[in-house]
Design a protein with these regions (language model features):
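Alpha-helical interface subdomain recognition
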Residues: 1-69, 77-79, 91-96, 103-108, ...
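Cytochrome P450 core scaffold surrounding the K-helix E-X-X-R motif
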Residues: 49-50, 122, 189, 219-224
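Flexible, glycine-rich active-site loops centered on histidine and acidic residues
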Residues: 85-91, 113-114, 168
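Short Gly/Pro-enriched turn/cap motifs at secondary-structure boundaries
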Residues: 119-123, 150-154, 167-169, 196-204
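Flexible, small-/acidic-enriched active-site or ligand-binding loops
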Residues: 127, 183-214
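A short core secondary-structure module
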Residues: 137-138, 142-190
Length: 381
């Protein structure tokens, strides 16, 4: 993958190639399949869809697979597909699994997850306005979503959409999750969004509208009013996997930082001799190792006691990991100077991805408030 990094960046940054993949891309995926490095992210409780690894075993693999920005796609463990596969493996009917899960696991299609909305504060996961109304053997969807990752690429064939189906219920039982094919009549991508000025092609984030979109009732996942339960089940493991990704990206930034410090000379000596640079390297190593150990502790807790028992650790990871990666990549950029902010290194992408993810799947502040409550409850304060 490393030898192809520059090729990939040059191809995807060319506006003529928007939403396309390089010709050689599928060949790398075939190699991953041949070497049995495919779908490793599904832990063994997702049998028969899992290769049989536990979360602790997955953690180190996922860290390594995340060192190149786009490499997760080569191993079929990229978001939001991996989260959607987990949902379908855990909650999907046999028919839903046959139609949607199997092609995802084979890497034949891609998918999106439509949760965030433009007209409400999405830091509240129950705060949604998209309506899901039953009409005989169909559900009708009306509303807007945005920051719908993957939806722009032609390979995206369906979305998991969360909306309000039962407003009469209590707050956490008002929403449902339903499968919507991207070719459904009434569904429209109104624009592709730029994150830090970039389209994130070939996946992309979309601003989308549902106008009387009809889907069969068999597309509903788990049942009416189960949307929040599904979202929490999906986002919990997703945050753990994001944390492993950030450890991998930060480790890559540290490796590049050390290489630069040893090889770059200023005022008659290598950067590595400068006390300020040494301190930045040491601080970065400490930050990465602390986060890595928290990832491993979270994985062990999930394996022993389940995801629900590990929610406090997963919450800590969502707070710590993106900020850690942002800080490490920022230090590396400072040592690289102008090269650090251009396309000649992956550092700019690492920095913007980690900054973006301090908002995605819930902002830092929400997780810190929630974690404070969990902490006080555990200490009986």
């Amino acid at each position: 993958i490393y030898p192809r990094e520059r090729d990939y960046d040059e191809f995807t940054s060319n506006q003529d190639n928007l939403w396309k993949y390089p010709d050689w891309y599928e060949g790398l995926k075939d190699k991953a399949k041949e070497q049995e490095l495919w779908n490793l992210f599904l832990p063994k409780e997702y049998a028969p869809w899992s290769p049989g690894l536990n979360n602790l075993e997955i953690a180190g693999l996922f860290e390594t697979m995340s060192k190149a920005a786009w490499s997760q796609q080569i191993f079929n463990c990229n978001a939001p597909d991996r989260g959607n596969m987990e949902v379908l493996a855990k909650y999907g009917t046999p028919e839903q699994q046959e139609q949607w899960l199997k092609p995802l696991l084979a890497g034949e299609i891609r998918s999106a997850y439509a949760m965030t909305e433009p007209d409400v504060a999405s830091s509240d996961a129950t705060n949604m306005e998209l309506e899901i109304t039953r009409d005989g053997d169909e559900y009708i969807l009306n509303g807007k979503k945005w920051w719908t990752t993957n939806v722009v690429t032609p390979k995206c064939k369906f979305m998991l959409v969360m909306g309000k189906s039962n407003p009469e219920n209590s707050r956490h039982q008002q929403h449902s999750t339903i499968i919507v094919p991207t070719d459904a009549e009434g569904f429209e991508i109104t624009r592709a969004l730029r994150a830090f000025g970039e389209y994130h092609s070939p996946g992309g984030e979309g601003d989308v509208v549902f106008k009387n979109v009809r889907v069969p009732v068999t597309n509903l996942i788990l049942g009416e009013g189960k949307g929040f339960e599904i979202a929490q089940g999906r986002l919990g493991p997703g945050r753990f996997q994001y944390a492993m990704m950030f450890v991998g990206m930060a480790q890559r930034a540290l490796e590049l930082m050390c290489e630069r410090a040893q090889n770059r000379v200023a005022f008659g000596e290598p950067f590595s001799k400068k006390t300020s640079v040494q301190h930045e390297i040491a601080r970065s190593r400490c930050d990465i190792e602390q986060c890595r150990l928290l990832v491993l502790a979270s994985a062990e807790k999930m394996d022993k006691y389940g995801i629900d028992a590990a929610r406090d650790y997963i919450s800590m990871l969502k707070i710590v990991a993106p900020k850690m990666c942002e800080d490490v990549s920022s230090r590396a950029i400072q040592i690289f100077g102008g090269m650090g902010v251009c396309q000649d290194t992956p550092l700019a992408h690492i920095f913007t991805t980690s900054r973006f993810c301090r908002i995605a799947d819930g902002p830092d502040e929400v997780h810190m408030s929630q974690h404070a409550k969990l902490t006080m409850r555990s200490l009986s304060v």
